[in-house]
Amino acid sequence: MKASYNIQDHFLNQLRKEMVPTTVFLVSGFQIRGVIKSFDNFTVIVESEGRQQLIYKHAISTFSPARNVTLYEPDAVEVTEG
């Protein structure tokens, strides 16, 4: 059985590991710019200017990283012929 691939967790984890500057857009329209420090099923911690903010995921609209991140490992991609 193939393990499921959670794109949200993988995307956030890559942003965290690569310390990519990211703009977090909230549903209210407010923007938070910083680096993802941690996340779980319900929250994301963003560090900006030496301060940490805990943001509830239900309040987030969009993550906009300053650059693209790798979304898969080349060895992990399954190739099918046909």
UniProtKB/Swiss-Prot annotation:
The keyword Ribosomal protein does not apply. Coiled coil: none annotated. One of its GO terms (biological process) is regulation of translation, ncRNA-mediated. Residues 9-69 form the Sm domain. One of its GO terms (cellular component) is cytosol. The keyword RNA-binding applies. Signal peptide: none annotated. CDD domains: Hfq. One of its GO terms (molecular function) is RNA binding. RNA chaperone that binds small regulatory RNA (sRNAs) and mRNAs to facilitate mRNA translational regulation in response to envelope stress, environmental stress and changes in metabolite concentrations. Also binds with high specificity to tRNAs. NCBIfam families: Hfq, PRK00395.1. Belongs to the Hfq family. This is RNA-binding protein Hfq. It comes from Exiguobacterium sp. (strain ATCC BAA-1283 / AT1b). The lineage of its organism: Bacteria, Bacillati, Bacillota, Bacilli, Bacillales. The gene is hfq.
